[in-house]
Amino acid sequence: MVYDFKAEIVKAKNSGSHHWLLQRVTGIILALCSIWLIYFTLTNKNNDINIIMWELKKPFNVVALLITVAISLYHAMLGMRVVIEDYVSCHKLRNTLIVIVQLFCIVTIAAFVVAMFYRG
């Protein structure tokens, strides 16, 4: 008998382990981003807004802040999906709420990216 690894991968992907893994990976990335965010906050706590805005225009800080916000919202989207799937019994309402949460996160990430690169 030949063991079918592809079938096991597909079964695992549909069983929730993929979602579980995404939650853990985004959580680890958020923990690392939190270290940067705490450092950035503590080093700029006595600065005025102009200096902080100048610091945020540095490429490393721009990328770090974009990653932090995007991963935070994606992590929240994954978590909200689990909560909605577990506690909303009406299928139509459940699917509607999941789509609303996903759209909210995508629009918020897109608006944040535009705001970070807006030079007004």
Curated annotation (Swiss-Prot):
Biological processes per GO annotation: cytochrome complex assembly; tricarboxylic acid cycle
Molecular functions (GO terms): electron transfer activity; heme binding; metal ion binding
Record topological domains on the Cytoplasmic side: 1-19, 85-94
Residues annotated as binding a ubiquinone: Y87
GO (cellular component) term, any one: plasma membrane
Major subcellular site: membrane
Cofactor binding summary note: The heme is bound between the two transmembrane subunits.
Cofactor(s) of this protein: heme
Domain of life from the UniProt record: Bacteria
Periplasmic-side segments: 41-62
Alphabetical UniProt keywords: Cell inner membrane, Cell membrane, Electron transport, Heme, Iron, Membrane, Metal-binding, Transmembrane, Transmembrane helix, Transport, Tricarboxylic acid cycle
Known pathway: Carbohydrate metabolism; tricarboxylic acid cycle
Membrane topology label: Multi-pass membrane protein
Entry keyword annotation includes Cell membrane: yes
Keyword Iron applies: yes
Residues involved in heme binding: H75
Cell compartments where the protein resides: Cell inner membrane
Transmembrane segments: 20-40, 63-84, 95-118
Assembly with partners or alone: Part of an enzyme complex containing four subunits: a flavoprotein, an iron-sulfur protein, plus two membrane-anchoring proteins, SdhC and SdhD.
Stated role: Membrane-anchoring subunit of succinate dehydrogenase (SDH).
NCBIfam families, A to Z: succ_dehyd_anc (TIGR02968)
Name of the protein: Succinate dehydrogenase hydrophobic membrane anchor subunit
